[in-house]
Structure formats: C-alpha cells, structure tokens
Amino acid sequence: MSAKRVEPKKTSLSKNYRAVCLELKPEPIKTYDYKGAKQEGPFTKPGGTKELKNELREVREEMKEKMEEIKQIKDVMDKDFDKLQEFVEIMKEMQKDMDEKMDVLINIQKNSKFPLRRGLKMQQELRLIGKTDTEPQLRLRKMDGAGGAPLSLHKKMVERQQPKDPMDPLHQCDSCFEKCLLCTPQNNYDRGKLPYHAWASFSPLASGPAF
C-alpha cells in the first residue's frame, strides 16, 4: 500500500478525543482486481498465451506421432518374438531328434564291438592251436626217432637195408598185374631194357608169345 500514515501532531491535552481522531484520518486505500491479474498473468506480455497454447498443441501432436510409432514398433517386436518362439521350438525338436539318433548309433556301436572282440579272440585261439599243431610236425621234419637223427639220413639207411626186388618196375601202377605189364614196355624202352614181348610169358592171361 502506498498510503502513508500521517504523523500525529502534537496537541494539547485540553482538546477532546474526537478532534484528535479526525485529524489522524488515513489516506484512502487503493485496491486491485486480482481476477484479471490471474488470467493475464503479472509477467506476461499481451498475446503470449496464444503462443504457449500453440506450442503445447504442437508438442501434443508430436507426442501422439511418437506414441503411434512406438506402438507400431511394439507390434513388429511382438511378431518377431512370436517367430523367435516358433524357431526356438523347432530347434528344440531338432535337438531332441539328434539326441535320439545319437543314442541309437551309440547302441549300435556297442553291439557291434562285442562280435568283433569275440572274432578277434577266436582268431587268436585258432592261431595258438595252429602253432601247437605245426610245432610237432616241424620237429618231426627236423628230427626222427629217439636218437634224434635227421630224417634224410634215416631214409637213406632204410633204403640201403631193404632188398631190391627185380619186379619193382611192374608194381609202379596201382591197378592189376596185366595193366602193369602194359605199362612196362615204355619204361623198359626208356631204361634200355627188353621190349614188351619178352615179358609176355609171365602173364597168366597170355595165350601165346604175343597178343
């Protein structure tokens, strides 16, 4: 308030109270319209509210556009997420199938290893049996008899001890005596002996000196 109080004048005590109060009358008080000040604002220029309103409208429109863009992005993300979920499910099924196939292969390998091991054991056993069978034969080929003499010397000694039979050429064949007589001419001819008719007299089937 710009009104100033008037300093009281010095009066004598003889004056009455009413006269003193009239002298001390204050100046009239000025009043302001606060409603108008609230609407216009104490520090705003004329026409400033319209600019603010326009700016607010622009900001709201931009916010709406951004919200729509965000909504579209969200829809795309939801679709992509659904696709990702489907892809994950497919991958899980494929992994499950691969695990089952791997189990089957492992079982097949385990089952195939046992026959192979059995076959190897059988081969080793057969080799050992063959070695045990061939060793005595090799020893017999190398040594003969209790004295341990070589087999070749033993054969020579036996050949010397056995008497020679003059009819040995006739017994070279395993068939009958007649066939042996038929075989002898060629052998005798090769050895420089008599021809076939010289031996014909020994044949029981011969009716004459020659056939």
UniProtKB/Swiss-Prot annotation:
- List cellular component terms (GO): nucleus
Source species, domain of life:
Eukaryota
Q: Which Pfam families match?
A: Tsc35 (PF15079)
What organism is listed for this UniProt entry? Bos taurus
Q: Which residues form the signal peptide?
A: none
Q: List the cysteine pairs that form cystine.
A: none
- Its protein name is Testis-expressed protein 35
Q: Which residues form a coiled coil?
A: 47-111
Keyword Coiled coil applies: yes
Q: InterPro entries, per this entry? A: Tex35
Organism lineage reads as: Eukaryota, Metazoa, Chordata, Craniata, Vertebrata
Sorted alphabetically, the keyword list is: Coiled coil
